[in-house]
């Protein structure tokens, strides 16, 4: 009897254990590497893989699914493909690629996956976001109406940029495209120091396919000017694989979207999208996608449009934040009719066209006003700027035309000669040294002098215009700082009178030596 009771007790214990047993089967979506060549792994299996999904190889290297067939998947390897071997197991993560976002990334240099590349230690970001996200819809947007000041005279006055705009910087190599972008970032330092948190402009600089030495110079320049404290640098250098170069601008855009979606303002530089397109072309050809014009795949337009459409000025309900994009595109011998330049021109809200001929003539920044345009920026210009800049573009265009005409050596009447002389002074006033941005109030003073006080200006020899400009601005700051502050919004008749008296007195005592 005793033994039988023991048996029944044992049976009940076993039954209880079986009924309460809870060890669910863990299902994983796995596959096997068939081949790997030039950073592309062909994987058998992965039946439930999604396009754009992140996967892990046996060695720990990450990859992204960019091609789906009946029983195979084409995966781009985010790292060294030597670590991936035939027969390796591949696991799906169930997630797309994410990057850390937030204020913790300011002042840091990261790669396309958000991993630190500087000596600042681990990034402890509270938030992470998908690098691919849908652009804001029509209802969520607002028209561009706030100025984004670059500190560059010829741009702020003649090709104004607004917060939320997409303005292309295009031109041949080594003629100042990156310099314009850097100067715009540096100029935000002065503005950020004077405004509250919600009006500050945070910056993201994305370096795509550049030499590491070039990126190091950019980072050092930002450090020297104090601009790195509000800037994040995303780097996919020339030594990185094509998939990393392809992901970099999307990662940078996601970092900028954090500020946009939280009611703040952000400026993002893509330097440059030509190399980005080349990286995508390389990936597409290796994935055996059919090539189109210039061997680019058919969806190269969508690759750039879905990136640039994420730049926007948000509506009041969405927090009034903004993301301003300055993409850079490199041309070959000034050919803007190539495939990628024409694509990006059609996507953006205007372009700043740099010309090598102007650059070698000494007119820097070498902006060709005739080919440059800002389609929405004028709505964001200050009233004081509109009043002085209205006739400047026309004067410069007339001067360029008359300059060509005067080369024939024919006799010129007095009015034509006057226009030529005025044009020479205007060209000198619009020249600007790199990394020395100028406030909008200082620009207004100089252009008002040209437009309304040319008789005073013409007393200065043209070779001394740069010295005159430098000394005059210093004179305003030290002796008449109140006048500059009044110019931050509008220009009244009283201010015009003050400027006339100040300039007249200054010209008489200006020392050319």
Swiss-Prot record:
The protein's name in its UniProt record: ATP synthase subunit alpha
InterPro entries in alphabetical order: ATP_synth_asu-like_sf, ATP_synth_asu_C, ATP_synth_asu_C_sf, ATP_synth_F1_a_nt-bd_dom, ATP_synth_F1_asu, ATPase_a/bsu_AS, ATPase_F1/V1/A1_a/bsu_N, ATPase_F1/V1/A1_a/bsu_N_sf
Binding site for ATP: 171-178
GO molecular function terms noted in the UniProt entry: ADP binding; ATP binding; proton-transporting ATP synthase activity, rotational mechanism
Function noted in UniProt: Produces ATP from ADP in the presence of a proton gradient across the membrane. The alpha chain is a regulatory subunit.
Species of the source: Wolbachia sp. subsp. Drosophila simulans (strain wRi)
Record localization: Cell inner membrane
Organism ancestry: Bacteria, Pseudomonadati, Pseudomonadota, Alphaproteobacteria, Rickettsiales
PROSITE patterns in UniProt: ATPASE_ALPHA_BETA
Pfam families recorded: ATP-synt_ab, ATP-synt_ab_C, ATP-synt_ab_N
Quaternary structure (record): F-type ATPases have 2 components, CF(1) - the catalytic core - and CF(0) - the membrane proton channel. CF(1) has five subunits: alpha(3), beta(3), gamma(1), delta(1), epsilon(1). CF(0) has three main subunits: a(1), b(2) and c(9-12). The alpha and beta chains form an alternating ring which encloses part of the gamma chain. CF(1) is attached to CF(0) by a central stalk formed by the gamma and epsilon chains, while a peripheral stalk is formed by the delta and b chains.
Catalytic activity: ATP + H2O + 4 H(+)(in) = ADP + phosphate + 5 H(+)(out)
Record keywords: ATP synthesis, ATP-binding, Cell inner membrane, Cell membrane, CF(1), Hydrogen ion transport, Ion transport, Membrane, Nucleotide-binding, Translocase, Transport
